Amino acid sequence: MMKRAFLFIALCCLLLAPASFPQQKKIKIIADQDSAGPQGTNFLSLLMLLRAKQVDLLGITTISGDQWVEPATVFALWATEITGRTDVPVIKGAQMPLLHTQREQELQEKIYGSYVDWHGSFNPDAPAPSETWPPPGGYPKVKARPGRAADFIIDTIRANPGEVILYCAGPLTNIALAVRMDPGIVALTKGIYIMGGSSNGGPELNWWWDPEAAAMVLREPWKEIVVSPFEAGAQVVSSERLMKEVVAAGGPLAAHVRQQYLESPPLAGTTNWSMMWDELLVASIIDPTVIKKSERMYLDVDVEHGSKYGYTVVWKPDGVPQFFLPYSGPRAPDQEKWRSHLAPPAQMHEARVQMEVDVSKFEKIFVNLMSD
């Protein structure tokens, strides 16, 4: 009887004791970003990464793209200040593409016509590369860490072998430089998540701005390549309704969102609302189920300096066409021959390309991260 009583008491103690679960390991990330601000996809995605409790943000490396690297660095530093994360280092990266120049682009457009609406730092009315301007409230007090972005990427990956995810939401110049300086980091990287390119084979700014860098990076044998193309991010759009939800939820970023999105009228010829390309990439790292459908593809970039310089090149090995009429005679298509025909060159590597987004889930993740 005493033994039963003892067992009963012990069981009650176990049931009443607080549950003890192993702490979930944080995702180690280096964010490589053309961090234009104080609004837009580049800046909001940085705020998400800086606020995410699931993320161990090891550093932010800046790059030219939507904005020159000098102002991009200013806004990346400011992002660390307004999120209370000045412990995260910001390292300035490359100012120019590996080969592509604004002058060459202008000449190409004279010959072939203009096929990209937005040129980023190559816009004809873009400021000078050295020009900066203060964020709301003035320039950040925190300074960029001395050194080169490529060196920081190399050193950080080698210090955390097999653990680091590269989040790449701008042109891939810094990543290409790091890989050329130390090819061994590719095998030591957990995975590379890239916002860029087009699943339909068209132009997109990040890869178009530095085609050679994008081609170099895509041809490396990373353990995992995840690409969020233009078409995926186009499914989620910032809106007054969404930003009102962020403000209503409260949190340290509510004032910033209210001021920048709900109280500040846009400049002439601009809008406060945009597609949320980079934010989607952040959300998919934190919760992969936000992507309802992905496809297996092999991607490259056209680096021939012709009419399609910078275009995405796509191989879809699973894309055997479905014939509605028996044009090949009374026999079914030869699946193996088609797959062999559609196979990419040997130097290409498989990527998981995001195709369909759970918009409702994405919006919940965005609001939670921005208000937590």
Task: Tell where the protein language model's regions lie, with residue ranges.
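Active-site histidine-anchored catalytic micro-motif
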Residues: Q24-T86, N123-R241
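Surface-exposed loop and adjacent secondary-structure segments within mature catalytic domains
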Residues: V88-P140
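Short, mixed-charge aromatic SLiMs
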Residues: Q67-V74, L98-L99, S198-G202, D300-V320
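Conformational coupling and interaction surfaces
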Residues: K25-I27, L47-A52, D56, W208, ...
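Boundary at the C-terminal end of the N-terminal hydrophobic targeting segment
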Residues: P18, P22-Q24
